[in-house]
Amino acid sequence: MTTPDAEDASPSPEYRSDQDDDMAAEQTTDRQSGDASPTQKPANGKPNAKDPLRPRRKKARRACFACQRAHLTCGDERPCGRCIKRGLQDHCMDGVRKKAKYLHDAPDGSLMPGVGGHYPYMNGNRPTPLPAQDTHTVSVSPQSNMYNQAQPPAAFYPPNSIPGQLPVTQDTRAFSNQQSPISPPFTQAHHASVQNAGAPSTMSQGQQGMQQFGPLFDPSDPALFNFDISSLNFGNHYGALEFGMLGHMSSGAVETPHDNNLMNNMSGSVNMYNQQVPSGYPDQNNAAAMAFGPNGLPGSEWQETQSRQGSMHVHTPNNTSGSGSHDHHPHRNDSLNGPHAFAIGQGPATHSTASPASTDASTYEGDNPLSTAAFFANANRPHAQRSPLVSRPQQENRPPTTALQSIHANGIRKRQRDTKSVYQGITKPYDYVKGYHRLYQLIDKKYSRPWVAKAQQYLQNYRPVLLQVREELNRDDLIHQEMGLQRHLMTLQEHFAEVGTPFLICRRSGEIVGINKEFTILTGWKRDVLLGHEPNLNVNLGTNRESSESDTSTQNTTPNLSAQDSEGATPSVNIIELMDARSALEFLQHFSELCYQDPRGYASQRVNMLRYQTKADVDRIHNMKNASSGDAKLDPLVKMEGGAVHQGESAMQRLGAKSGMVDCMIWWHIKRDIFDMPVLVCMSVMPVLDKGLP
């Protein structure tokens, strides 16, 4: 390097600023007076730098590296005049400009002036490979020391290799020459030294798929996120990388790889993934190659880095390796699972379009080692190396993924119901004849003579049809009918339990089979009493019979069955026992209309529900009335704009406390079985709230 002269100017000792007019930075020209001579020179003989008519040199499109550091002007020629003057002509090269954000992944060569339109990898184009770049197949013999089963010979496409003659004898546990994981420049020369090998190299199919993986986060590798950018024709490569990273984070954040015992010991793993050392290198390098991987990492870290890659190899413009995902399960249903977010465009470079259907994400949780959670949570755990050809038969033996399995895998839980008691515990049909006999007895006991005739007329509208259909069914049909009723009841109870309104479910003959807690609070009827588990001690009958009428009637009375008299089980409470006489008669009328005349209809009516009151409850209420003499003060109500409202269970329990009846509105409809026979009555009960408590 020459000694800087007085004409050089630089912020550092090596580069000094130049005061020559042709090499100095452009200055703002000051307006001179009209009588000033344009050719006038100062006393030192140098031209005036502020002269507007002085010759100007053309501004360079890109300065060289030395001039760029010195913040001086430069020329378009290489080497430039300043570097020649200072003896730096051998090192004169274009300076590196700061890339824009959208040019982050563009190679430096594509940003050279005049090269943008002719750069071979712009706009998704692919250059014609040179003769030295042609990939020739090399026969690969099966590997047997790692996998016991034999593998057919396959074609191996060798990557870029270091020039040199390979030895004839190869260690079967080691790789052949492997390309560096770091992306090479686009002008890297390709060598075909593998073609001149004296003997065919041997490697396993699993090692072949894993040797071509690059680093996980190489920013200069276009195949960073499992798709070939040059084949997408986006135009904005940086945007593609951004969306690829977002999809990578969202699609793999919950996946964790399976932990299995397929890993070999550390020494075997390191020996298996080392690159071959050519014959031109000394033998002492073998020790370093055995301890470190191709990218300079220790053997264990190199193995973990490779385990995070997929098992599908994607070609890129720089001949770097990208990782993809093989379809480990041929029966996967993409319509339910769907491809992962960055699966668009995934696949070999031969695909001209980015179709989500052409790619398949990992079916199982552990098959995606690129997941974010798996990468950070299991950074120090060994991962099993999967070979595409060897693990394929094992994975094909897995059961096919059905729609139900896919839904459960995504976290949607299924209701767990114990249906064995329904399908295995029911061995005989329900005796509706006994139920209707008891219904007739309740009607005769509850109603007066004129009302009994009306109730029997309502029953005659539909019961003959039920008896006719019953004669066409055998015992198995009736058992199946009861199973369907109990199974349907199980579903209805789950649905009504999620709604905070009182509900009631009964058979077509009136027996109660299902209630909820809200109905118990509203009416005071306990669940065990309604279902027949406890004796019914209710004395609040709500009858309209006159005291002069006889308790027993010999006209239109169905005799008791002998089996019914001997039966010791307590029957369920009938629905007409929960209503007063007028409300129960109206219910029977609506049921006769909806049973067959309007099978898909519903009914709503206002009823008086009877509260459950035993003899002790009636005596206590009577004593409280006598003691208070009407002077008892009720609890204060919560005041709102619309008046007083009822708050809590205690307010609901006081409804109908004096009269023994709760004013309600009911809405109900009929459920049918496969024989189109009415089997269940589903009823919602809503109390009619007044402004004040009764």
UniProtKB/Swiss-Prot annotation:
Which Pfam families does this UniProt record tie to the protein? PAS_13 (PF24990)
| A single GO molecular function term of this UniProt record | zinc ion binding
Residue ranges, compositional bias (Low complexity): 205-214, 349-363
Record field: compositional bias (Polar residues): 193-204, 302-324, 392-408
Q: Which SUPFAM superfamilies match?
A: Zn2/Cys6 DNA-binding domain
- Cross-referenced SMART domains, in alphabetical order? GAL4
Q: What keywords were assigned to this record?
A: Activator, DNA-binding, Gluconeogenesis, Metal-binding, Nucleus, Transcription, Transcription regulation, Zinc
From the Swiss-Prot or TrEMBL record, state where the protein is found: Nucleus
Q: Which residues bind DNA?
A: 64-92
Q: Where is the PAS domain?
A: 485-559
Ranges for the region named Disordered are 1-57, 175-216, 289-369, 384-420, 539-569
Any one GO BP annotation for this protein: gluconeogenesis
A GO cellular component term found in this entry reads:
nucleus
Main localization of the protein described in the UniProt heading: nucleus
What the record says about family reads: Belongs to the ERT1/acuK family.
Kindly give the PANTHER family that the UniProt entry links to this protein: TRANSCRIPTION ACTIVATOR OF GLUCONEOGENESIS ERT1, ZN(II)2CYS6 TRANSCRIPTION FACTOR (EUROFUNG)-RELATED
Q: What does this protein do?
A: Transcription factor which regulates nonfermentable carbon utilization. Activator of gluconeogenetic genes.
What is this protein's record name? Answer: Transcription activator of gluconeogenesis PTRG_06536
